[in-house]
Amino acid sequence: MENYNQTSTDFILLGLFPPSKIGLFLFILFVLIFLMALIGNLSMILLIFLDTHLHTPMYFLLSQLSLIDLNYISTIVPKMASDFLYGNKSISFIGCGIQSFFFMTFAGAEALLLTSMAYDRYVAICFPLHYPIRMSKRMYVLMITGSWMIGSINSCAHTVYAFRIPYCKSRAINHFFCDVPAMLTLACTDTWVYEYTVFLSSTIFLVFPFTGIACSYGWVLLAVYRMHSAEGRKKAYSTCSTHLTVVTFYYAPFAYTYLCPRSLRSLTEDKVLAVFYTILTPMLNPIIYSLRNKEVMGALTRVIQNIFSVKM
């Protein structure tokens, strides 16, 4: 029997897993995905740190993406799993605010970081001679700190505003985490002003970055087409297609949830789509970036050989 343990300020997360065998199967599946995401992203961070061949702006940005994904999925899955395991789906008002803040911080930072990674590839392929200047250490450190800071500021503003809205007696959030669009359905007041604010923020963090990424890769594909080296074209296509796959997995469901009017989508759709950008993407990113990347696989081989040579 589920024990909500609710107080007047608690929210109830209805969750993703039904109380049945299917729910148990999904619980086990998502815990395995969570563990894969932890192992994959931690391995990517350690690999880039340990292998000097990967000490480049491209891989430094990739290590930050892994760090964001690691925190991203850790903000959502442990609470969701414990809710199902112990049957206590309540979350305090403050706890909900903290989860919402970190979720939006990591989401915003990842959107901006993916744009920085696209710019990095654009400069590397279209202006290779200018790459050391345009992507200096100062530049990529600014990109990373800027992504984190802007994501945090945006998240702080939304969290403070969302948690000052009066909520009705029904505190049941039809979601598996404290997502603002799902919470707005419980508000006792008209939230159209805030919804427009969310739309504007989503445009800044989704539409503008995606447009920048699309333009960058448009120029990249044109430059690749003009390359004389077949090996160079193959490497460039591989790198770009990998990044575009990650971008599509992340941006498409996010854009539908936050830019599509509430009347044209259901809360069930929001929950299913949220699985893509909160759980599946953090698990898939290290796999996508490593399987098709000879430099990463080569670095992995070198690190393993060094470990065994030290032991011997």
Swiss-Prot record:
Q: Does the keyword Cell membrane apply?
A: yes
Its subcellular locations are: Cell membrane
Matching Gene3D superfamilies:
Rhodopsin 7-helix transmembrane proteins
What topology in the membrane does the UniProt record assign? Multi-pass membrane protein
Q: Which UniProt keywords apply?
A: Cell membrane, Disulfide bond, G-protein coupled receptor, Glycoprotein, Membrane, Olfaction, Receptor, Sensory transduction, Transducer, Transmembrane, Transmembrane helix
Q: Name one Pfam family in it.
A: 7tm_4
Q: Where are the transmembrane segments?
A: 25-48, 57-78, 100-119, 139-157, 195-218, 236-258, 272-291
Sites carrying a glycan are: 5
> Among the record's GO biological process terms, what is one?
detection of chemical stimulus involved in sensory perception of smell
- Cytoplasmic topology ranges: 49-56, 120-138, 219-235, 292-312
Q: Has the keyword Chaperone been applied to this entry?
A: no
The UniProt GO MF terms for this protein read: G protein-coupled receptor activity; olfactory receptor activity
Q: Which InterPro entries match?
A: GPCR_Rhodpsn (IPR000276), GPCR_Rhodpsn_7TM (IPR017452), Olfact_rcpt (IPR000725)
Q: Extracellular side of the membrane: what ranges?
A: 1-24, 79-99, 158-194, 259-271
Where is it mainly found?
membrane
What domain of life does the native source organism fall in?
Eukaryota
Q: Which cysteines are joined by disulfide bonds?
A: 96-188
Q: Return the CDD domains for the record.
A: 7tmA_OR2T-like
GO CC terms of this entry: plasma membrane
Please report which protein family the annotation says this sequence is part of. Belongs to the G-protein coupled receptor 1 family.
- Purpose of the protein: Odorant receptor.
Q: What is this protein called?
A: Olfactory receptor 2L5
Q: Which organism is it from?
A: Homo sapiens (Human)
Q: Which gene encodes it?
A: OR2L5
